[in-house]
């Protein structure tokens, strides 16, 4: 059984004392448990840690993330099924009631597992309803792009591990490609975070979006922004932010892209 008080103590007061953050604190701890288990499994040679939870646990972005996403190579449905069962068994042996409720869709191009934790929030005193849903999704998909993974150190909540991750420029390009494809509010926020640190990999963007250089990237981003309501988008991820006021950063995304330039590939103010 998880010890909520012990888990909360790993987080600074401004995070742990906010009632809205408590279930995300628990989720992050379980994500770390799963990553720690996978880091010592045979599957770690076939998967690379990507997505928003990478930004949170590896890069230190100031928001929670809900899913565990992996790029995978030489990894088939049987591998994912075995990995999924091993993760479930690990959680159950750790004293956590965990159940898989997933039917793979023929239309889905990724391997996906939804792990439900029945009554966990109720047992931890975080919900008055036994039936309140609490889940973590694990998704693995071959991104179809070759790169050499790097080993990143993840140190959080008493866990310490090394895990394969993409180079920063590839991770940035993955996020920009996601933004251009689905335009979620968190994608704009994450893109600002990554572009302040690194340039994107244009080979990836060429393959996925037909973007070859900075000029084309800025044009495509501005075109995308003009089709969405950023005020509305800012509300779809505010619950994940440590400070909800930071959601307003994406409202100036268009001006930021138009008025700033990339020096050495990174976005900097002119």
Q: How should these model regions be labeled?
A:
Residues 52, 59-80:
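Catalytic metal-binding acidic patch
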Residues 1-32, 37-47, 58, 75-270:
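Structured mid-to-C-terminal alpha-helical surface segments
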Residues 52-53, 186:
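Gly/Ser/Thr-rich helix-start
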């Amino acid at each position: 059984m998880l010890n909520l008080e012990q888990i909360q103590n790993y987080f600074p007061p401004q995070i742990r004392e906010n009632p809205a953050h408590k279930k995300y604190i628990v989720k992050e701890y379980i994500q770390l448990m799963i990553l720690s288990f996978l880091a010592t499994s045979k599957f770690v040679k076939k998967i690379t840690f990507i997505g928003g939870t990478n930004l949170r646990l590896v890069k230190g972005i100031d928001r929670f993330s809900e899913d565990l996403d992996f790029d995978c190579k030489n990894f088939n449905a049987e591998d994912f099924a075995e990995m999924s069962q091993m993760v479930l068994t690990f959680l159950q042996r750790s004293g956590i009631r965990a159940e898989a409720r997933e039917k793979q869709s023929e239309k889905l191009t990724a391997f996906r597992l939804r792990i439900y934790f029945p009554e966990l929030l109720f047992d931890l005193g975080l919900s008055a309803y036994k039936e309140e849903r609490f889940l973590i999704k694990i998704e693995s998909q071959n991104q179809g792009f070759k790169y050499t993974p790097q080993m990143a150190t993840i140190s959080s909540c008493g866990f310490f591990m090394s895990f394969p991750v993409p180079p920063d420029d590839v991770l940035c390009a993955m996020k920009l490609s996601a933004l251009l494809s689905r335009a979620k509010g968190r994608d704009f926020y994450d893109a600002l975070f990554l572009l302040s640190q690194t340039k994107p990999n244009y080979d990836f963007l060429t393959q996925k979006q037909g973007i070859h250089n900075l000029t084309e990237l800025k044009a495509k981003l501005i075109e995308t922004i003009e089709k969405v309501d950023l005020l509305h988008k800012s509300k779809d991820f505010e619950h994940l932010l440590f400070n909800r006021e930071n959601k307003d950063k994406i409202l100036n995304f268009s001006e930021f892209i138009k008025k700033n330039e990339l020096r050495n590939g990174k976005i900097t103010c002119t």
